[in-house]
Amino acid sequence: PVLAFKPTDRTDLVIDLQLKGGCSAIFHAYDEPDVERLMQSPFGMIGSDGSLTKPGDGAPHPRAFGTYPRVLGRYVRERHVLTLEDAVRKMTSFPAQRFGLWQRGLLRPGAWADIVVFDLGRLHDRATNLAPHFYPFENYPHRYPEGIDYVFVNGVRVIEPEGHTGALPGFV
């Protein structure tokens, strides 16, 4: 068991866990004032390193479903750390331009239409770690955010109030 290792055995612990199928971990490196300062930087973009899984396959990290609703709900609506316009720009056009994705991030003729229709007043992230001391990445069942009514990928509606439409217009 993990708790049986002494602090001096950290390298052995990591090697042993990898040999037994690997592991995942959550590290908290920033406190709230740091997060808010970073968000307000004119050079800061908003993104997530949360891993995604298909519903029913494994347990995704809560950030996979909660990052953007958290920013809009907590830091825009509740705490006024960013304006709605700044937050949306930091999530869409700014990263798209920075990474050279010229057909993404803006609504304009000739660009791909990736659109999220949300109600800021109802927007709430619901993703959690259900058992943080046992299996830190457990997020089963998938807990999608509240307040997102429609999602369009490449101009095709994929999410509506009733759920996924079955359309898969995205590509890699």
Question: How should these model regions be labeled?
Answer:
Residues 1-20, 33-124:
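His/Asp/Glu-enriched, well-ordered alpha-helical/loop segment
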Residues 25:
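The substrate-binding groove and active-site-proximal loops of carbohydrate-active enzymes
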Residues 37-43, 48-51, 117-169:
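C-terminal cap of metal-dependent C-N hydrolases
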Residues 67-69, 168-171:
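Cofactor-binding beta-sheet edge motifs in enzyme active sites
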